[in-house]
A protein has these predicted regions:
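A generic "binding-loop/recognition-motif" signal
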Residues: 11, 50, 58
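Histidine-centered metal-chelating micro-motifs
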Residues: 3-4, 42-53, 71
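A cytosolic small-molecule/anion-sensing beta-strand core signal
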Residues: 19-20, 39, 58
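Conserved short histidine dyad/triad with adjacent acidic residue
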Residues: 1-10
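Short acidic-glycine-tyrosine-enriched beta hairpin
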Residues: 29-48
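Double-stranded beta-helix
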Residues: 53-76
Length: 76
């Protein structure tokens, strides 16, 4: 299922590695929403302070590596 919230990590980058299926990562920047499609084996970086969420059409598995300290969330 697609995420029901946005999140932001202020203290470090987050590596998002798709290991199975596919996801679309949405990142909120000043110029608008940037969508990045990830298939198995592909990764993206969420920079510190960037609000992000994800859409998942079917099913997917991903690994998230980040500094969780100070993480904020908000409804989508």
């Amino acid at each position: 299922d697609s995420w029901r919230h946005w999140e932001m990590h202020p203290r470090g980058d987050e590596v998002v590695l798709c290991t199975e299926g596919a996801i679309t990562l949405l990142q909120e920047h000043e110029e608008g929403i940037v969508r990045t499609h990830l298939s198995a084996g592909e990764y993206a970086i969420n920079e510190p302070g960037v609000w992000h969420t994800a859409d998942i059409a079917n099913s997917a598995t991903a690994i998230f590596i980040t500094s969780g300290e100070g993480t904020e969330g908000r409804p989508r």
